[in-house]
Amino acid sequence: MFKPQHMYDREFGTGNGYSNGNGYTNGNGHTNGNGNYNGNGHVNGNGKANGAKVVKMKPMDSELLREQGHIMVDFIADYYKNLQDSPQDFPVLSQVQPGYLRDMLPDSAPERPESLKELLDDVSKKIMPGITHWQSPSYFAYYASSTSVAGFLGEMLNAGLSVVGFTWLTSPAATELEIIVLDWLAKLLQLPDHFLSTGNGGGVIQGTGCEAVLVVVLAARDRILKKVGKTLLPQLVVYGSDQTHSSFRKACLIGGIHEENIRLLKTDSSTNYGMPPESLEEAISHDLAKGFIPFFICATVGTTSSAAVDPLVPLGNIAKKYGIWLHVDAAYAGNACICPEYRKFIDGIENADSFNMNAHKWLFANQTCSPLWVKDRYSLIDALKTNPEYLEFKVSKKDTVVNYKDWQISLSRRFRSLKLWMVLRLYGSENLRNFIRDHVNLAKHFEDYVAQDPSFEVVTTRYFSLVCFRLAPVDGDEDQCNERNRELLAAVNSTGKIFISHTALSGKFVLRFAVGAPLTEEKHVTEAWQIIQKHASKFTRNDHY
């Protein structure tokens, strides 16, 4: 069970300005006892409302926030400390069964307020067992949901201000900081000037990469339909590869593109699963001859499956030749491109119409934060703008003002640029580069382990911090090899000590080892390899079972 020691030290202490008795203040209009009401609207230890009248609580109280905020920070800090010091208490992959929580919680919400202590006890005893610990140093399954002190503090400040910056007027700082911070990040990535706010392009923070892909598909669709007419929507064709993220297909379907008009080009090991330019041009030529209208190409830098990289230079030349919108989805690997040694992977970006990355994946900005840059902001705005009367203000009509409601699907939007600003300032770009390099080096360390063991093989060329590997086939039997790797994956993950995932490449069942959790060190990689080797021992090359 999770035991947040510092939280309880503070909660049960006295004389520290925060707690009295069992952790809640008395005499200041807050709580007393165990967190339930007495007749004056405060708490009286027996869980019942005493007196004839219950005084309403205030939803926001600065002193209660100060008191309970300290308790919550202690709780979270203890969680991170325990992830490191007591990993046996935190199975990386949750071991519960579906529906486990239903029998542990009441059927209805409480009528009377409960104490924070009771709530956090329930988190420890009931919620934590159902958590897959993405922040565990032994989490290696999917691309990271990277967190940091700076990102966490930015989320706190965002929640505290709780602004809704859908137009410039509704919070000028929210809009202007986003513009500035995304220009900063674009310069770190050495993006072309047409992606900066000083021209016709600019950046916007979407919630996720999926949202980013959706809005640019809509922008590209409307741009081409203005030229050819709306009646030709059924003729529109898009292109990706069989490694392109599944959100691309979903975005196209939402945008009214017929499923049969989504061309996912086949990849293989000869290109390390990158999109082959010759296949793309052949598909475009074939579609044009059939009367279709090619309008969108989705290239990827760092695919979800294997971190493959599509060749942007030739793809960009093809897009330019045929006047097709080229989007570059670099949700994971785009973060690494702030490092000079990885910038080469987005060479050719100058021919792209849009580019997105997820700062919450590998730039330590916490969920969610997905910067998107477009070459022509007006194509995006024309596809997404709404102008209801209740949002009409004189200042909002000025061309110098950005109204981000017209750059996204939803109206409401969080002040996400705060945490990105704080991450960039509190760490500095050089530290961020080094964080990324450390993860890549740890992945290289794991890759070396795999390469040195003749029972295993590295399946794809490693570019970043993902290693694709597997138990090698015996006597060329791929079916048996796939089954062995399935069994190995299940055995390793059932330990709760580490969590890895899998993918399929050219019919091969492949194991994925993705480094990216902020607490991961070399010892965790070594321990993970030892666990994998231990469970693989029954699958030696000489074992034909």
From Swiss-Prot:
Tissue expression: Expressed specifically in flowers.
Binding site for L-tyrosine: H245, H360, Y390
One example of a Gene Ontology biological process annotation: carboxylic acid metabolic process
Presence of the UniProt keyword Membrane in the record: no
Homology family: Belongs to the group II decarboxylase family.
Function: Converts tyrosine into tyramine, a precursor of isoquinoline alkaloids and various amides.
Protein name: Tyrosine decarboxylase 2
Species, as recorded: Arabidopsis thaliana
Lineage of origin: Eukaryota, Viridiplantae, Streptophyta, Embryophyta, Tracheophyta
Name of the coding gene: TYRDC
